[in-house]
A protein has these predicted regions:
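Active-site-adjacent beta-strand anchor residues
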Residues: 69, 142, 168-169
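C-terminal lobe and adjacent flexible extensions of AdoMet/dcAdoMet transferase-like proteins
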Residues: 206-210
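Mobile active-site "lid"/loop adjacent to the S-adenosyl-L-methionine
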Residues: 118-148
Length: 210
């Protein structure tokens, strides 16, 4: 990794978060997800696709014990740096792992809350940026917008506590009927806990449980 952090920072609930040009920058969907989360200091939390780490750090600020993962090595390095930067503000802790979704979660590890802001933009092959950058990994949801979300839903039964809950972001640009099918096949109950419209797109935060 030879690209240095951008040194661009922002503040959220007292946390100082540094950004990086190879990492998805927190946007409206990030803050909407943060607003919807119900996490307490008793919770064991898993965040997939942590990016700059803002969601995991906010959960740790509330006192949760957090494991977060990201396929992007720049995100892993940056989240570790942001964790160290904000350590004195956190009542909980954060462990950062480099891997794709649940691939680095150990057998038997289960969580009270699982959180994911997935790549949800419907994307055809010709629309991909390509190259060595990480933009596609952060945004490409496949043709339906649900390629990665489907894998997330299918993995929950192995890692979510029976009385736990999972939160994820859904865009109205994606296929909601397919999402309903995936949730039904996984025997998950769902509700939309926060919904907002941005121009021609509606962003929903789903909360699901067994």
């Amino acid at each position: 990794m030879n690209k240095k952090p951008s040194n661009k920072t922002f503040h959220y609930n007292g946390l100082t978060i540094e950004l990086h040009p190879e990492i998805y920058e927190p946007a409206e969907d990030t803050f909407q997800l943060l607003e919807a989360l119900e996490v307490t200091e008793c919770d064991r939390v898993l965040e997939l696709g942590t990016g700059c780490g803002i969601i995991s750090l906010e959960c740790a600020r509330r006192g949760a014990k957090v494991i977060c993962t990201d396929i992007n090595p720049y995100a892993v390095e940056l989240t570790k740096n942001n964790y160290s930067r904000n350590l004195s503000l956190l009542k909980g802790n954060v462990e950062v792992r480099n891997g794709n979704l649940f691939s680095v979660i150990k057998p038997g590890e289960r969580f009270d809350a699982v959180i994911f802001n997935p790549p949800y933009l419907p994307t055809r092959a010709k629309e991909r940026v390509g190259g060595s950058g990480w933009f596609d990994a952060a945004t490409d949801g496949g043709v339906t917008g649900l390629a990665v979300t489907k894998r997330f839903i299918e993995g929950l039964h192995k890692y979510l506590n029976k009385d736990g809950r999972a939160y994820f972001v859904f865009s109205s640009l994606s296929d909601r009927k397919k999402l309903d099918t995936y949730l039904s096949n996984a025997r998950l109950k769902s509700e939309i806990v926060l919904s907002r419209r941005f121009n021609d797109e509606q962003i929903d935060i789903y909360r699901v449980h067994f």
